[in-house]
Structures are given as C-alpha cells and as structure tokens.
From Swiss-Prot:
Upper taxonomic lineage: Bacteria, Pseudomonadati, Pseudomonadota, Gammaproteobacteria, Enterobacterales
Taxonomy, superkingdom: Bacteria
BP GO terms, sorted: D-xylose metabolic process
Residue sites binding Mg(2+) 1 per the record: E232, E268, D296, D339
Taxonomic source organism: Escherichia coli O139:H28 (strain E24377A / ETEC)
The EC number(s) this enzyme carries: 5.3.1.5
Enzyme class at the top of the EC tree: isomerase
Cofactor detail note: Binds 2 magnesium ions per subunit.
Protein name: Xylose isomerase
Assembly, per entry: Homotetramer.
Gene of this entry: xylA
Length: 440
C-alpha cells in the first residue's frame, strides 16, 4: 500500500544546530541521561483519537481536514486504512508506544454484538501492526462518553442498563488491551459528573461509581491483566462538575472505596490548568500520595476555560515536572502520551509531525535540565535544610505519635519556646531554577 506520508522517510535526531523542521534537535533516543537511554526515560506515546479521529470540527464549524479514512465508505475497511496510516506515523515518528479508545480503532456498530465483533477484528489488525512495527500499546481505554446513551454519564447514569452497556465496553476494551500487551488501562470519567443538583443524587452516583471501579479491579485480576489501572482526573467539561476533579479528590474517592492500592493516576497538564492547579502541582501531589502512574503531556490556555489540548512547548514548565518524576524513580508502566491535537487551521498532513516533533524535543530538553538539577542536588539540599528540625528528637517524637497535643503544650511552656521564622528564599530558588534552564 502506498505510504500516506510519502515525502518523509523517518524523523531523525540531527542536533540543536539543525534547521530541518522534520528532525529532532534535542530528542536522541539513545542518549544516556542519568545512566538510562532517553527513550526509556520518556516512554513517548502518540494518541489515536486527536491524531487520526478528529476531523477538525468544532462547535462553530464542520470538519476542516481531508483525511482519506474519514470519507464515506465501509466502516471496517476505513478503520483498517486508518490503522495503516497510524502505524506508518508511529514508525516514522520513532515513538515506542501508542494509546487508543475502543471506538478510535474500531467502528462502534449498531448493537453490542456488532461492537464486539468489529473490535475483535481490529484487535487482530492492531496485533499484526504491533508485531510488524515494534510499536507497543501504552494503554487502552473505553469511550463511555461520546454516544448519546451516555448523556447522563456511564457509571453514574440513573439507568442501570446504561451502566451495564458501559461495563460491556470496559470488559471488551480491557481484554483487548491485555491481548495487545498494553501496560496500563485508563479510566476517564468523561461524563461522570452533573450539570445541576436539581436532578442529581450525589450519594447514589458516588456509590455507583465506586462499585463500578471495584468491578473493574475485580475483572483485572480475573483475566490476569498485569498492567496498571489509571484514573485521569478532570474538573469539568463536558459536565459542569466532574467527580474526579483533581489528584487529591480522586485520592479521597479511592480511599472511600478501598481502591487506593489498586488504581493510580494518569495526570494531564491541561486538566490541571482547568482545575486551577499547575501541572507541577498535580504531578507532585500524585507522587506524594503514592498514586503517580502516567502522564498525558499537553498544554492548555490559562485564558480559556476549556480543554485546548495543545502540544507542550514550555521547557520551563516541564523541566520541573520531569524533575519530580525523576526524583520519584521515573516511569514504571506509564509514559508521556501526547494527548494533543494540531490546530483547526493546521490542515497540512505533515503538521501532525511538526506538533509531535516539537513536543518530543520540549520533553527531551526538559529531561536533560531535570537531570542536571538531580545531579547538582541543590534544590533537594535546600528543602532538607528547611525541614531539618523534624529530624530532631522533638520532631521525631511528634511524627511517631509519642507526644499528645497536651504534651506539646507542656513542652513548649517548659522550654520557653520562642521560634523565629526562617526565610523561605523563594526568589533565590527561582533564580537557581533559571540557572539550570538558561545557563549552559
């Protein structure tokens, strides 16, 4: 079959002096960073949905892209053509992983039977493509939010029959992910929330969602899936308020239903923006709570209140994110999935490469800067100094539960405590970070 991207062989690393827009300037897969290949640190993935399913439509205009697999025709044949182009893209971009929703790769059909049969055929196609290309599946998931049946949610729907349909999709998508060797399975509650409390029973919906997640965990163990289950937090859109608002909210939910040891988090940069947090904050929070799993690498627009899903281009922002990830030991089953799309006006097919190349270079440079921060150790040293009092006898007795509130009050009076505030030196630390960012 003729190549779709016929003007490009493969994207290659050419170094920072290159002016070739279809070459990497910073991402060198084989470069060693802290003793590990860059490719192994970053674990890049391209997503199926924004890259090959979006047709350029928005709320104010119809599809703007001319994609051959989005033209009228037999649904399965078009899905197979889309898979051909997708794996050509993955290969030429040098990404080791990809991600999908069930209906990204397979026609939904008019019934559950058609859905299952179509998906089974496409899983065989994807398995062959993976074998041929060496590209692996980072994670799969089920789209339980686009079809009108999910207007009031999937797991939180007032109709148990909709709940059951969603369960069928998750079973099918998880088993497909397992068969394809996927390293994670993602759960994003696209419409698990509410528009108005006037028709919503919050307790009922929370119980439904909790039971659904428990069943997902049960099924994972039943089929022997060894990958990681991930929830992707998002505060709103498409609903007014979603139950998986941010990392801290999801932690509370998981604790309530006894799932905190079973499910981790897939953190998206743009969702952090919508929640009023920095990307850095959400990553650090997930790590602090022991829930860090994977990342959807993109960016939002602080001046817009919706998910713009742009490609990451801020080395400054992502250097601190990669610093947190490296400090925590790096990715295990997770990676950096580009949940990002070209702009509606970017209608040239090679714009897909420009977006991903820039994003991969951004994250590669961020990784190298983060590694310098780790090797230097100055930030860690400053934080250790700031909290050093907690290593004292008093600090340890407090943390180990050896002193009560009354004991502390007595101690403070007996020792005539008069603590003096110590500077946080924020400005100095910001200058230090800029040194890593901008000084060679």
């Amino acid at each position: 079959m003729q190549a779709y991207f016929d003007q490009l062989d493969r994207v290659r690393y050419e170094g920072s002096k290159s002016s070739n827009p279809l070459a990497f300037r910073h991402y060198n897969p084989d470069e060693l960073v802290l003793g590990k290949r860059m490719e192994e640190h970053l674990r890049f993935a391209a997503c199926y949905w924004h890259t090959f399913c979006w047709n350029g439509a928005d709320m104010f205009g119809v599809g703007a892209f001319n994609r051959p697999w989005q033209q009228p025709g037999e649904a399965l044949a078009l899905a197979k053509r889309k898979a051909d182009v997708a794996f050509e893209f993955f290969h030429k971009l040098h990404v080791p992983f990809y991600c999908f929703h069930d209906v990204d790769v397979s026609p939904e059909g008019a019934s559950l039977k058609e859905y299952i049969n179509n998906f089974a055929q496409m899983v065989d196609v994807l398995a062959a493509k993976q074998e041929e290309s060496g590209v692996k599946l980072l994670w799969g998931t089920a789209n339980c939010f686009t079809n009108p049946r999910y207007g009031a949610g999937a797991a939180t729907n007032p109709d148990p029959e909709v709940f059951s349909w969603a369960a069928t999709q998750v079973v099918t998508a998880m088993e497909a992910t397992h068969k394809l060797g996927g390293e994670n399975y993602v759960l994003w509650g696209g419409r698990e929330g509410y528009e108005t409390l006037l028709n919503t029973d919050l307790r009922q919906e929370r119980e439904q969602l909790g039971r659904f997640m428990q069943m997902v965990v049960e099924h994972k163990h039943k089929i022997g899936f060894q990958g990681t289950l991930l929830i992707e937090p998002k505060p709103q859109e498409p609903t007014k308020h979603q139950y998986d608002y941010d990392a801290a909210t999801v932690y509370g939910f998981l604790k309530q239903f006894g799932l905190e040891k079973e499910i981790k988090l897939n953190i998206e940069a743009n969702h952090a923006t919508l929640a009023g947090h920095s990307f850095h904050h959400e990553i650090a929070t997930a790590i602090a709570l022991g829930l860090f799993g994977s990342v959807d690498a993109n960016r939002g627009d602080a001046q817009l209140g919706w998910d713009t899903d742009q490609f990451p281009n801020s080395v400054e922002e992502n250097a601190l994110v990669m610093y947190e990830i490296l400090k925590a030991g790096g990715f295990t089953t997770g990676g950096l999935n580009f949940d990002a799309k070209v702009r509606r006006q970017s209608t040239d097919k090679y714009d897909l490469f420009y977006g991903h190349i820039g994003a991969m270079d951004t994250m590669a440079l961020a990784l190298k800067i983060a590694a310098r921060m780790i090797e230097d150790g100055e930030l860690d040293k400053r934080i250790a100094q700031r909290y050093s009092g907690w290593n004292s006898e008093l600090g340890q007795q407090i943390l180990k539960g050896q002193m009560s509130l009354a004991d502390l009050a007595k101690y403070a009076q007996e020792h005539n405590l008069s603590p003096v505030h110590q500077s946080g030196r924020q400005e100095q630390l910001e200058n230090l970070v800029n040194h890593y960012l901008f000084d060679k």
